[in-house]
Amino acid sequence: MAYKDYYEVLGVSRSASDSDIKSAYRKLAKQYHPDKNAGDESAAEKFKEIGEAYAVLSDPQKRQAYDQFGHTGQVPPGGYPGGGFQGGDFGGFDPSQFSDFFQEMFGGRAAGMGGRGGFTSPDGRPIDLEDLFGGLGGMGGAAQGGGRRFVQNVEGELQVSLSEAFEGSDEIINVDGRRLSLRVPAGTRDGARLRLAGQGPGGGDVLLTIRVLEDARFELDGDDLTTSVDVPAPVAALGGAVTVQTITGSGQLNVPAGSSGGRRMRLKGQGWPKKSGGRGDLYVRLNVTVPKELSEEERQLYEQLRDLQR
């Protein structure tokens, strides 16, 4: 089993802070995102590798286990001490697609619920829903003398992408060997709760907490979204239109003359759905770019501009 250096994958040191790791992930995820590299298999593999590294290093427990055991190339029997991880821990990636190193280290799948979530007992321990009817006393099984099963509510998390949360999505989860369909409403926010009444073991409820995954393109703050766009230096100086990616597609942003890097501009009504109706705004950070390579004509023009400013 080949050792995976997750710090090297993200280009950070082993002493990197949480914010350093998050920043490195966002930068690389944006660079290798499938939407920007359609049909590029190497970029897709890199994107998956970045996701695997971030899934480990962004979680304190995973990172501690990785730092303790990963560098030795020897994984303790059964994976890291404490067992597998619950759903919601893998940053939106399917852990079954991660490397053999990850599978050996962390066990890959979450217990209980297939797909993108995991069910837990009320005290937070991962549980297998099949065990709820297996004689676990207050956690399930048959009541003594009556032969009646206890009603058991189960809780879990369901991960959805930012786009799915915005548009709404149809999901299928596995509960106690049954496939249940549910609808995540459009405009759902992180932490929202969905209840499937009577669908749990013994006629209990299934309670789902929605986890909206981070998106390399957008940041959500209340009703507003924030993104960034590259603006060529001449456009920043003279003004002009640039294409901005929105959560529903793309739009045109008119950049005023004399704009500097870091300036925030607003596209009204292009943000998140409001509970009261309508949508918030999309804020766009301008990233003024300078070409690394110049044609002879461009070089001459830049030299003339430089000379004028002396």
Curated annotation (Swiss-Prot):
Question: What are the recorded Gene Ontology BP terms?
Answer: chaperone cofactor-dependent protein refolding; DNA replication; protein refolding
Example GO molecular function: unfolded protein binding
Cysteine pairs forming cystine bridges in this chain are none
Q: Where is this region: Disordered?
A: 257-276
* Keywords of this entry: Chaperone, Cytoplasm, DNA replication, Repeat, Stress response
Q: Domain J: where?
A: 5-70
Domain-level remarks: The J domain is necessary and sufficient to stimulate DnaK ATPase activity. Zinc center 1 plays an important role in the autonomous, DnaK-independent chaperone activity of DnaJ. Zinc center 2 is essential for interaction with DnaK and for DnaJ activity.
Q: What is this protein called?
A: Chaperone protein DnaJ
* Gene this protein is translated from: dnaJ
